[in-house]
């Protein structure tokens, strides 16, 4: 804690400086002293403030020189409807059977839409290298719903998902995207998570030199 205090005094990024930043943003009140009710009092004061801050960050527009919103939460904001835990997190206790859904929801992945950010590429240049002779932006929607390279596997996945929810096939692409990343049952959660994992594994195999025509041998939804 002493070392962290020294880092904070030098304005270095650490846990303590982040706590201090949130303390300032949320205007955390100074309590008279610890008591049985102080925790409840502080929680009652901070919860609505944090929710307001969270909603502001979720919808914040960060317009760049290209007139495009560069908010990293752009995908998450289309999926997150309330300040509460998502149901799918409680439907499947095994973290590995839902982690890929979470990664795609919060943009914690290696799709070019994110890799390009760190390389300083314009969004228009963050294209999908797995599409043949096309210039599609390699974002979450394209990856999950549109990339033609994985059309056969996706159609198989869609068929299995539709057997669980027959209304799925009538949805638009954007609606399907939101539906898949907001699964309602444990079966939907595991199926979608498995497909996303397969897609990432598939892309990795292509990077290693495997032919797309032979990948069906290694992966099945």
Where do the protein language model's features map onto the residues?
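Family-specific functional microsites
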Residues: 63-64, 68-221
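Extended C-terminal regions of large enzymes
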Residues: 1-112, 219-220
């Amino acid at each position: 804690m002493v070392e962290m205090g020294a880092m904070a005094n030098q304005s270095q990024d650490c846990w303590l400086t982040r706590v201090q930043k949130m303390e300032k943003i949320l205007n955390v009140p100074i309590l008279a002293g610890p008591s049985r009710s102080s925790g409840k009092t502080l929680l009652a004061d901070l919860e609505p403030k944090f929710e307001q801050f969270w909603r502001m960050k979720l919808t914040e527009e960060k317009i760049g020189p290209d007139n495009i919103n560069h908010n990293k939460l752009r995908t998450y904001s289309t999926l997150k409807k309330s300040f509460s835990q998502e149901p799918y997190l409680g439907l499947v206790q095994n973290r590995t059977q839902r982690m890929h859904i979470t990664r795609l929801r919060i943009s914690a992945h290696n799709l070019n839409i994110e890799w390009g950010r760190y390389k300083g590429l314009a969004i228009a240049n963050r294209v999908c290298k797995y599409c043949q002779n096309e210039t599609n932006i390699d974002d979450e929607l394209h990856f999950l719903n549109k990339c033609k390279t994985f059309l056969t596997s996706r159609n198989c996945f869609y068929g299995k998902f539709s057997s669980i929810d027959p209304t799925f096939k009538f949805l638009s692409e954007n609606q399907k995207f939101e539906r898949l990343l907001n699964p309602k049952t444990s079966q939907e959660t595991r199926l979608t998570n498995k497909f996303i994992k397969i897609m990432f594994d598939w892309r990795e195999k292509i990077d290693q030199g495997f032919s797309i025509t032979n990948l069906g041998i290694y992966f099945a939804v």
